[in-house]
Protein backbone atom coordinates (compact mmCIF):
# COMPACT_ATOMS: atom_id res chain seq x y z
CA UNK A 1 0.00 0.00 0.00
CA UNK A 2 2.80 2.40 0.93
CA UNK A 3 5.06 2.19 -2.12
CA UNK A 4 2.51 3.15 -4.83
CA UNK A 5 1.51 6.17 -2.72
CA UNK A 6 5.15 7.26 -2.38
CA UNK A 7 5.85 6.66 -6.07
CA UNK A 8 2.80 8.72 -7.01
CA UNK A 9 4.08 11.69 -5.00
CA UNK A 10 7.13 11.84 -7.26
CA UNK A 11 5.31 10.89 -10.47
CA UNK A 12 2.60 13.56 -10.38
CA UNK A 13 4.82 16.66 -10.90
CA UNK A 14 6.68 15.16 -13.87
CA UNK A 15 4.28 12.78 -15.63
CA UNK A 16 0.51 13.18 -15.28
CA UNK A 17 -0.23 10.11 -17.40
CA UNK A 18 1.93 7.93 -15.17
CA UNK A 19 0.33 9.44 -12.08
CA UNK A 20 -3.13 8.65 -13.47
CA UNK A 21 -2.06 5.06 -14.08
CA UNK A 22 -0.77 4.74 -10.52
CA UNK A 23 -3.90 6.42 -9.18
CA UNK A 24 -6.06 3.94 -11.08
CA UNK A 25 -4.08 1.11 -9.51
CA UNK A 26 -4.59 2.66 -6.07
CA UNK A 27 -8.35 2.97 -6.63
CA UNK A 28 -8.99 -0.46 -8.16
CA UNK A 29 -6.45 -2.58 -6.29
CA UNK A 30 -5.29 -0.88 -3.13
CA UNK A 31 -8.61 0.38 -1.74
CA UNK A 32 -9.97 -3.19 -1.39
CA UNK A 33 -6.56 -4.41 -0.24
CA UNK A 34 -6.39 -1.73 2.44
CA UNK A 35 -9.53 -3.03 4.12
CA UNK A 36 -8.37 -6.63 3.71
CA UNK A 37 -5.14 -5.75 5.54
CA UNK A 38 -7.05 -3.97 8.31
CA UNK A 39 -9.31 -6.99 8.67
CA UNK A 40 -6.36 -9.36 8.88
CA UNK A 41 -4.21 -7.42 11.34
CA UNK A 42 -6.71 -5.34 13.33
CA UNK A 43 -9.93 -7.35 12.94
CA UNK A 44 -11.44 -4.27 11.28
CA UNK A 45 -14.49 -5.25 9.23
CA UNK A 46 -15.85 -3.63 6.07
CA UNK A 47 -19.55 -4.17 5.46
CA UNK A 48 -20.75 -3.06 2.04
CA UNK A 49 -24.45 -3.74 1.61
CA UNK A 50 -24.33 -4.74 -2.06
CA UNK A 51 -28.03 -5.57 -2.29
CA UNK A 52 -28.79 -1.89 -1.73
CA UNK A 53 -27.08 -1.05 -5.05
CA UNK A 54 -29.48 -3.07 -7.19
CA UNK A 55 -31.86 -0.15 -7.80
CA UNK A 56 -29.12 2.21 -8.95
CA UNK A 57 -29.20 3.62 -12.50
CA UNK A 58 -26.13 3.69 -14.74
CA UNK A 59 -25.08 7.17 -13.60
CA UNK A 60 -26.09 9.10 -10.49
CA UNK A 61 -24.97 11.56 -7.82
CA UNK A 62 -23.97 10.18 -4.42
CA UNK A 63 -24.68 12.27 -1.32
CA UNK A 64 -23.43 10.97 2.00
CA UNK A 65 -22.60 11.83 5.56
CA UNK A 66 -18.90 12.37 6.22
CA UNK A 67 -16.81 10.95 9.08
CA UNK A 68 -13.11 10.54 8.22
CA UNK A 69 -10.46 10.52 5.51
CA UNK A 70 -11.11 6.78 5.18
CA UNK A 71 -14.52 7.62 3.69
CA UNK A 72 -12.90 8.12 0.28
CA UNK A 73 -11.19 4.68 0.02
CA UNK A 74 -14.30 3.14 1.64
CA UNK A 75 -16.50 4.44 -1.17
CA UNK A 76 -13.94 3.37 -3.76
CA UNK A 77 -14.11 -0.11 -2.28
CA UNK A 78 -17.92 -0.20 -2.21
CA UNK A 79 -18.32 1.13 -5.75
CA UNK A 80 -15.20 -0.49 -7.20
CA UNK A 81 -16.94 -1.08 -10.57
CA UNK A 82 -17.64 2.67 -10.95
CA UNK A 83 -15.46 5.68 -11.68
CA UNK A 84 -16.03 7.87 -8.62
CA UNK A 85 -15.11 11.55 -8.46
CA UNK A 86 -15.28 13.38 -5.15
CA UNK A 87 -16.12 16.96 -4.24
CA UNK A 88 -13.58 17.93 -1.58
CA UNK A 89 -11.77 20.90 -0.11
CA UNK A 90 -8.57 21.74 -1.93
CA UNK A 91 -6.42 21.20 1.18
CA UNK A 92 -7.01 17.44 0.75
CA UNK A 93 -5.05 17.65 -2.49
CA UNK A 94 -1.83 18.27 -0.55
CA UNK A 95 0.25 16.18 1.86
CA UNK A 96 -2.13 13.24 2.45
CA UNK A 97 -0.50 9.93 1.44
CA UNK A 98 -2.50 7.71 -0.92
CA UNK A 99 -5.17 10.39 -1.38
CA UNK A 100 -3.76 13.77 -2.49
CA UNK A 101 -2.04 12.87 -5.75
CA UNK A 102 -4.93 10.58 -6.69
CA UNK A 103 -7.43 13.42 -6.21
CA UNK A 104 -5.40 15.73 -8.43
CA UNK A 105 -4.44 13.22 -11.12
CA UNK A 106 -8.03 11.99 -11.55
CA UNK A 107 -9.44 15.54 -11.67
CA UNK A 108 -11.68 15.36 -8.65
CA UNK A 109 -13.51 18.56 -7.69
CA UNK A 110 -11.20 20.57 -5.45
CA UNK A 111 -13.13 23.45 -3.85
CA UNK A 112 -10.88 26.42 -2.94
CA UNK A 113 -11.09 27.23 0.77
CA UNK A 114 -10.23 30.84 0.04
CA UNK A 115 -12.02 32.89 -2.56
CA UNK A 116 -15.55 33.94 -3.38
CA UNK A 117 -18.56 31.59 -3.40
CA UNK A 118 -18.92 32.43 -7.09
CA UNK A 119 -15.54 30.85 -7.82
CA UNK A 120 -16.46 27.75 -5.81
CA UNK A 121 -19.75 27.36 -7.70
CA UNK A 122 -17.93 27.69 -11.03
CA UNK A 123 -15.59 24.86 -9.98
CA UNK A 124 -18.61 22.68 -9.14
CA UNK A 125 -20.34 23.57 -12.41
CA UNK A 126 -17.29 22.63 -14.47
CA UNK A 127 -16.99 19.42 -12.47
CA UNK A 128 -20.64 18.56 -13.16
CA UNK A 129 -20.12 18.95 -16.90
CA UNK A 130 -16.96 16.85 -16.76
CA UNK A 131 -18.51 13.88 -14.95
CA UNK A 132 -21.41 13.79 -17.41
CA UNK A 133 -19.03 13.82 -20.36
CA UNK A 134 -16.83 11.07 -18.89
CA UNK A 135 -19.65 8.92 -17.45
CA UNK A 136 -18.31 9.26 -13.90
CA UNK A 137 -20.12 9.16 -10.55
CA UNK A 138 -19.85 12.39 -8.50
CA UNK A 139 -19.73 12.04 -4.71
CA UNK A 140 -20.68 14.96 -2.45
CA UNK A 141 -20.60 15.28 1.34
CA UNK A 142 -23.22 18.00 2.01
CA UNK A 143 -22.10 18.46 5.64
CA UNK A 144 -18.96 20.08 4.26
CA UNK A 145 -16.79 18.72 7.08
CA UNK A 146 -16.23 15.53 9.06
CA UNK A 147 -18.51 14.87 12.03
CA UNK A 148 -17.02 14.97 15.52
CA UNK A 149 -19.57 12.82 17.33
CA UNK A 150 -20.74 10.42 14.61
CA UNK A 151 -24.15 12.04 14.18
CA UNK A 152 -25.22 13.59 10.88
CA UNK A 153 -24.71 17.35 10.77
CA UNK A 154 -26.56 19.96 8.78
CA UNK A 155 -26.69 19.34 5.02
CA UNK A 156 -25.75 22.52 3.15
CA UNK A 157 -27.49 23.02 -0.16
CA UNK A 158 -25.29 25.29 -2.31
CA UNK A 159 -22.85 22.74 -3.72
CA UNK A 160 -25.52 20.07 -4.15
CA UNK A 161 -27.89 22.44 -5.93
CA UNK A 162 -25.25 23.55 -8.41
CA UNK A 163 -24.14 19.96 -9.06
CA UNK A 164 -27.73 18.75 -9.44
CA UNK A 165 -28.59 21.57 -11.85
CA UNK A 166 -25.49 20.94 -13.97
CA UNK A 167 -25.47 17.14 -14.03
CA UNK A 168 -29.25 16.51 -13.94
CA UNK A 169 -28.79 12.99 -12.53
CA UNK A 170 -30.71 10.79 -10.09
CA UNK A 171 -29.47 11.06 -6.51
CA UNK A 172 -28.37 8.12 -4.35
CA UNK A 173 -28.41 8.87 -0.63
CA UNK A 174 -25.80 6.70 1.12
CA UNK A 175 -25.22 6.08 4.81
CA UNK A 176 -21.69 5.53 6.07
CA UNK A 177 -20.57 4.67 9.59
CA UNK A 178 -17.38 3.72 11.40
CA UNK A 179 -15.02 6.52 10.51
CA UNK A 180 -15.89 9.05 13.20
CA UNK A 181 -14.14 7.00 15.86
CA UNK A 182 -10.86 7.19 13.93
CA UNK A 183 -11.10 10.77 12.62
CA UNK A 184 -8.27 11.70 14.99
CA UNK A 185 -5.04 10.38 13.45
CA UNK A 186 -3.50 9.99 16.92
CA UNK A 187 -3.48 6.34 18.00
CA UNK A 188 -5.33 5.42 14.80
CA UNK A 189 -4.11 1.81 14.78
CA UNK A 190 -5.38 1.29 18.33
CA UNK A 191 -8.74 2.82 17.42
CA UNK A 192 -9.05 0.61 14.34
CA UNK A 193 -8.86 -2.61 16.35
CA UNK A 194 -12.13 -4.58 16.31
CA UNK A 195 -13.92 -1.74 14.55
CA UNK A 196 -16.03 -1.71 11.41
CA UNK A 197 -17.01 0.42 8.41
CA UNK A 198 -20.46 0.21 6.87
CA UNK A 199 -21.89 1.68 3.66
CA UNK A 200 -25.41 1.34 2.31
CA UNK A 201 -27.59 3.05 -0.28
CA UNK A 202 -30.66 4.13 1.70
CA UNK A 203 -32.70 5.68 -1.13
CA UNK A 204 -32.49 6.60 -4.82
CA UNK A 205 -34.28 9.80 -5.84
CA UNK A 206 -35.23 10.87 -9.37
CA UNK A 207 -33.22 13.80 -10.72
CA UNK A 208 -34.58 16.95 -9.02
CA UNK A 209 -36.19 19.48 -11.36
CA UNK A 210 -36.74 22.38 -8.96
CA UNK A 211 -35.04 23.99 -5.95
CA UNK A 212 -37.89 22.69 -3.81
CA UNK A 213 -37.17 19.11 -4.90
CA UNK A 214 -33.47 19.61 -4.20
CA UNK A 215 -34.23 20.77 -0.65
CA UNK A 216 -36.60 17.83 -0.08
CA UNK A 217 -33.91 15.37 -1.21
CA UNK A 218 -31.36 16.85 1.19
CA UNK A 219 -33.75 16.90 4.14
CA UNK A 220 -35.08 13.38 3.57
CA UNK A 221 -31.58 12.00 2.92
CA UNK A 222 -30.26 13.43 6.17
CA UNK A 223 -33.16 11.86 8.10
CA UNK A 224 -32.77 8.46 6.43
CA UNK A 225 -29.00 8.41 6.94
CA UNK A 226 -29.29 9.23 10.65
CA UNK A 227 -31.97 6.55 11.02
CA UNK A 228 -29.65 3.99 9.39
CA UNK A 229 -26.77 4.98 11.68
CA UNK A 230 -29.00 4.55 14.72
CA UNK A 231 -29.96 1.05 13.55
CA UNK A 232 -26.36 0.03 12.90
CA UNK A 233 -25.24 1.21 16.32
CA UNK A 234 -27.55 -1.29 17.97
CA UNK A 235 -25.40 -4.04 16.39
CA UNK A 236 -22.07 -5.40 17.52
CA UNK A 237 -19.18 -4.25 15.31
CA UNK A 238 -18.70 -7.72 13.79
CA UNK A 239 -22.37 -8.30 12.89
CA UNK A 240 -23.71 -7.37 9.47
PLM features: residue spans?
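Short glycine-rich anion-binding loops that position phosphate/pyrophosphate groups of nucleotides
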Residues: 66-68, 143-146
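Residue-level preference for the first positions of well-ordered beta-strands
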Residues: 59-61, 135-141
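A cross-family acyltransferase "interaction/gating" segment
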Residues: 98-100, 133, 137, 148-212
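Membrane-interfacial terminal anchoring regions of lipid-handling membrane enzymes
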Residues: 1-29, 51-56, 130, 179, ...
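A short, well-structured juxtamembrane/interface segment
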Residues: 33-60
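Catalytic core of membrane glycerolipid acyltransferases/transacylases, capturing the structured
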Residues: 5-29, 56-115
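Anionic-ligand binding region
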Residues: 127
Amino acid sequence: VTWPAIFNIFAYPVNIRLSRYISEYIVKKLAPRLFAILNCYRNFKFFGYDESKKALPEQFIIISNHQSLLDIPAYMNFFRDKELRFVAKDNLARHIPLVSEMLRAHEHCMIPRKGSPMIAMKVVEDFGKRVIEKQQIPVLFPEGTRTRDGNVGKFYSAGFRKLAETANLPVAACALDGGWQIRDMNNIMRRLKNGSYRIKVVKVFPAPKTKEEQVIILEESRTLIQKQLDEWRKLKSDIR
